[in-house]
Amino acid sequence: MSYTIAAQVRTEIGKGSSRRLRHAKKVPAVIYGPGKEAISIVFDHKDIINIQENQDFYTSELTIALEGKDVKVRVQDMQRHAFKPMIEHVDFKFA
């Protein structure tokens, strides 16, 4: 199954800006990989909360629509809140 997530590039980086994003129902994330520069991104929490319940979300390639470009990635790591059904941060790896 193919999943697509619409995202924007993040300009503010750090703990304070990440907390502000989470309060606004956004998820900070990063895309990295060998030989490529890391890209900090942000997307809506509602875009990922339902699709992450499917098992193939973690093993298949995802498409991130990033400023008019489609970037193929795989989920490397996902950090969740301790007791709330919230995703706090996602690490993606270039596919």
UniProtKB/Swiss-Prot annotation:
Keywords, in A-Z order: Ribonucleoprotein, Ribosomal protein, RNA-binding, rRNA-binding
Family matches, as SUPFAM superfamilies: Ribosomal protein L25-like
Pfam families according to UniProt: Ribosomal_L25p
Record-level Gene Ontology MF annotations: 5S rRNA binding; structural constituent of ribosome
Assembly information from the UniProt record: Part of the 50S ribosomal subunit; part of the 5S rRNA/L5/L18/L25 subcomplex. Contacts the 5S rRNA. Binds to the 5S rRNA independently of L5 and L18.
Similarity comment text for this entry: Belongs to the bacterial ribosomal protein bL25 family.
Protein function: This is one of the proteins that binds to the 5S RNA in the ribosome where it forms part of the central protuberance.
Name under which the protein is recorded: Large ribosomal subunit protein bL25
Naturally occurring in which organism (per UniProt): Shewanella pealeana (strain ATCC 700345 / ANG-SQ1)
Gene (UniProt): rplY
